[in-house]
């Protein structure tokens, strides 16, 4: 191999590594179990998937109960989604990334009429982007499945939070797609 072709090979390899490092990562919660081993509902304080740690943004302020997440099944598809298990106190769900990411797209489903908010934060806890809906898409007819919808935020993102449901409502994240910063 000549020096020029060796250098060309190394540059090609470096370019391929650069492109691969920015590939989109997908989380789908399909490894979550509908019931825990003891038969109890699937409420957890923390969930980790592909290095992303899901928690509530803060502990409950209106009760002494432990803040928990839950996995919720979309009836029409069987897909599993993650949501706040706090039915009487709306607490945002937080997803913290192991390294900064440049964009996050979440596929959600929710109670009819629920507002939805997706916020992106940098490592200094500053909001860098926000997406919101005053009311999520609803069913066209009563027999239709609850529809999915997407929300996207961009920036130098350390973590995101999603929220919006009022007492008794839910907002479930079906799939989280993110692109690591290069």
What does each model-identified segment do?
Residues 1-9:
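Bacterial N-terminal signal peptides that target proteins for export
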Residues 8-17:
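Bacterial N-terminal signal peptides
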Residues 21-182:
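Surface-exposed, well-ordered secondary-structure segments
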């Amino acid at each position: 191999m000549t020096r020029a072709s060796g250098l060309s090979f190394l540059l090609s390899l470096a370019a391929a590594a650069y492109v691969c490092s920015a590939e989109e990562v997908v989380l789908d919660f399909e490894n979550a179990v509908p019931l825990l081993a003891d038969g109890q509902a699937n409420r957890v304080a923390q969930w980790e998937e592909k290095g992303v740690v899901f928690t509530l943004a803060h502990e409950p302020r209106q009760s002494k109960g432990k803040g928990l997440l839950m996995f919720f099944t979309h009836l029409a598809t069987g897909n599993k989604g993650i949501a706040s298990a706090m039915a009487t106190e709306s607490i945002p769900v937080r997803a913290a990334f192991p390294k900064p990411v440049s964009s996050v797209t979440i596929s959600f489903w929710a109670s009819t009429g629920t507002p939805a908010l997706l916020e992106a934060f940098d490592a200094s806890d500053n909001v860098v982007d926000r997406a919101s809906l005053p009311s999520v898409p609803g069913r066209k007819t009563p027999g239709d499945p609850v529809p999915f919808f997407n929300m996207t935020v961009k920036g130098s993102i350390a973590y995101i939070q999603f929220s919006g449901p009022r007492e008794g409502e839910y907002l479930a994240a079906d799939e989280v797609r993110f692109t690591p910063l290069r």
